[in-house]
From Swiss-Prot:
Self-association and partners: Homodimer; disulfide-linked, upon oxidation. 5 homodimers assemble to form a ring-like decamer.
Thioredoxin domain span: 2-161
Organism annotation: Helicobacter pylori (strain J99 / ATCC 700824) (Campylobacter pylori J99)
Protein name stated in the entry: Alkyl hydroperoxide reductase C
CDD domains: PRX_Typ2cys (cd03015)
Domain of life, source organism: Bacteria
Keyword Disulfide bond: yes
Miscellaneous notes: The active site is a conserved redox-active cysteine residue, the peroxidatic cysteine (C(P)), which makes the nucleophilic attack on the peroxide substrate. The peroxide oxidizes the C(P)-SH to cysteine sulfenic acid (C(P)-SOH), which then reacts with another cysteine residue, the resolving cysteine (C(R)), to form a disulfide bridge. The disulfide is subsequently reduced by an appropriate electron donor to complete the catalytic cycle. In this typical 2-Cys peroxiredoxin, C(R) is provided by the other dimeric subunit to form an intersubunit disulfide.
Length: 198
């Protein structure tokens, strides 16, 4: 489990948003002001994967506005990533997504993040990594279960709220909701006002 630990750094080839290839793309050199969303998918040119990639890409601006970059990883080569980006959506491609797509051809990144499945492909892992490279949230889905990019945005908002106000974010918390002081009195006050909504 990586939550609360430093995220494993890596250097690998990546296809950038402008379709250039960075042969030495490093996670630690590509954090946003507040951190990064690092997500894995099993394989290019498959089925659930393009829906997730397109969903994250449609929200890249939202993540950037919150100070987070988005980086994707699969075990495919940079050439396969490039081909998939240049395949139209209506033909099963992903189109010109704007975030870097890392080529984990050695599978070492997937292994380091504990998402490598049967030494073959990555499970659907997603990691919220803060500006200090600490993993603050992780979710790993089985192959048939797609992730929700909006839930990752919610987790980003929760982390930013905690960092700014020092309040913890209870179940179902959304930006604009009241946080909770992490004390016995704080939880009692919160539950008195909000337990019916939980």
């Amino acid at each position: 489990m990586l939550v609360t630990k430093l995220a494993p750094d890596f250097k690998a080839p990546a296809v950038l948003g402008n379709n250039e290839v960075d042969e030495h793309f490093e996670l630690s050199k590509n954090l946003g002001k507040n951190g990064v969303i690092l997500f894995f998918w099993p394989k290019d040119f498959t089925f659930v994967c393009p829906t997730e990639i397109i969903a994250f890409d449609k929200r890249v601006k939202d993540f950037h506005e919150k100070g987070f970059n988005v980086i994707g990883v699969s075990i495919d080569s940079e050439q396969v990533h490039f081909a998939w980006k240049n395949t139209p959506v209506e033909k099963g491609g992903i189109g010109q997504v704007s975030f870097p797509m890392v080529a984990d051809i050695t599978k070492s990144i997937s292994r380091d993040y504990d998402v490598l499945f049967e030494e073959a492909i990555a499970l659907r892992g997603a990691f919220l990594i803060d500006k200090n490279m600490k993993v603050r949230h992780a979710v790993i889905n089985d192959l048939p279960l797609g992730r929700n990019a909006d839930e990752m945005l919610r987790m980003v908002d929760a982390l930013l709220h905690f960092e700014e106000h020092g309040e913890v974010c209870p179940a179902g918390w959304r930006k604009g909701d009241k946080g909770m002081k992490a004390t016995h009195q704080g939880v009692a006050e919160y539950l008195k006002e909000n337990s019916i909504k939980l």
